[in-house]
């Protein structure tokens, strides 16, 4: 079996087909930064709790943190190769692990994952997580999260 390698395909992947104006870039970065700050806090908390023989959760939190750092680099333009976005698992973690136990963290990961999906799909226009057409209940959900988690909401 012969696999043909096309440098054009690689070049297309290295230059995303989406465009992001400066305002959208800043908003996307704000979503990712909020998720990253909370991920770093959760990672530190879990690492402090887990003993040396009990390291089951730390890798998951580290993975989420690394994916968010990579996404930030893609949004800022520091990272041109968007191929790794195809391998992101943080959205799955948000649903399976955090939706019930840590809704604020799940929300932050969902927002960052949504932005990553927009980039991965090479959308010509990036829709933000608070887009009223895509998520009409966004602001009500945010008000509920802020009421439940006032000390971490603006982290």
Q: Where do the model's predicted regions map?
A:
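Amphipathic alpha-helical binding modules
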Residues: 87-155
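Short terminal alpha-helical segments
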Residues: 2-59, 142-144, 149-152
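Detector for Asparagine
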Residues: 9, 31-34, 66, 130, ...
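Hydrophobic transmembrane signal anchors and adjacent membrane-proximal interface regions, especially
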Residues: 1-8, 69, 126-128
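Non-membrane alpha-helical secondary structure
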Residues: 20, 24-27, 31, 56, ...
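Charged, amphipathic alpha-helical oligomerization/scaffolding segments
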Residues: 23, 27-41, 63, 67-70, ...
């Amino acid at each position: 079996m012969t696999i043909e390698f096309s440098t054009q395909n690689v070049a297309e992947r290295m230059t995303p087909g989406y465009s992001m104006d400066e305002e959208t870039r800043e908003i996307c970065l704000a979503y990712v930064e909020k998720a990253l700050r909370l991920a770093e806090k959760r990672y530190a908390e879990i690492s402090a709790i887990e003993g040396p023989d009990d390291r089951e959760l730390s890798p998951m939190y580290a993975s989420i943190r690394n994916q968010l750092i990579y996404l930030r680099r893609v949004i800022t333009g520091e990272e041109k190769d968007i191929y790794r976005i195809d391998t992101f698992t943080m959205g799955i973690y948000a649903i399976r692990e955090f939706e019930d136990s840590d809704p604020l963290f799940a929300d932050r990961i969902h927002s960052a994952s949504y932005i990553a999906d927009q980039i991965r799909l090479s959308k010509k226009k990036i829709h933000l997580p608070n887009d009223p057409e895509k998520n009409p209940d966004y602001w009500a959900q945010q008000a509920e999260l802020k009421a439940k988690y006032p000390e971490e909401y603006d982290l």
